[in-house]
Amino acid sequence: MSVAFILLQQLEKSTNIKYTLQKSPIDSRDHVMITKPTVTIYSVNLSSRCPPVFDQGQMGSCTANATACMHYCLQKKSNEFIPSRLYIYYNSRVLQNDVNRDDGATLRVTIASIAKNGVCHETLWPYNPANLYMKPTSNCYTEGATRRISAYASLAIQLAQMKGALQGGFPFVLGILVYSSFVSMSVAMTGNVPIPNPRREQLLGGHAVCVIGYDDSKSAFLVRNSWGSRWGWNGNFWLPYAYATNPNLAFDAWVLYSDNLVASSPNVSVTIPTHPK
């Protein structure tokens, strides 16, 4: 199979994706993560802590895919497992009163569902389109009850705060608006995402991703997508700082924490309060 054919397949896949991410409404009760870096760090790469690249297929489950990636990155490596994405997606839609539709979710609701129902192994509730509208089994909820998160918080759409979270060992989920340039052959081949021109490009919709690093030499964040490992740069892409910190293009940055998860760095002070369930 030729490289060109593979790239054409990936380009076709990206144009058929459901861009269903919904922006979370403002809630004054949200806690905000505050980071205070103590040294200058020019690049961070947490990809070695990531799971294999997910492929969401034709389901509008980008929030669950991004959040499952974030959760995995924070797990203790002696006891790591892939969280069930459809368990997360189903419970998110329950909280959103939209369980019988594949219309996406907000990132706040997605993370809140983990605080309420926890996560379970994907082996218990596999990522199978046949499971999309089915309630997970009781075994899933039994395990999930032992794997709830104790805290989650929003992260300011500000460069210093976003880089500070990564320096502290915290990957974060992020919502972005996707324009037609994002699904170009160039991006599918290189993973280098341009800053869109909203006046000239078609808005395709919202998409949730997991930010796993940054590089000042590129002025960009390293981001894990959920379109398979053949898309972009081994399933990842570089999102310019100017894109990720523009409130007209990016929104809903969230982090999570739990006693059974690990994220720490001696070079950054992180304040993340317990969030009410």
For the regions a protein language model found, what residue spans apply to each?
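Non-catalytic, low-structured ubiquitin/UBL-interacting segments
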Residues: 1-49
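Predominantly the structural core of cysteine protease catalytic domains
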Residues: 2-18, 22, 64, 68-72, ...
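General helical secondary-structure elements
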Residues: 25, 81, 89, 143-144
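Substrate-binding/charge-relay-adjacent region of secreted/lumenal peptidase catalytic domains
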Residues: 30-116
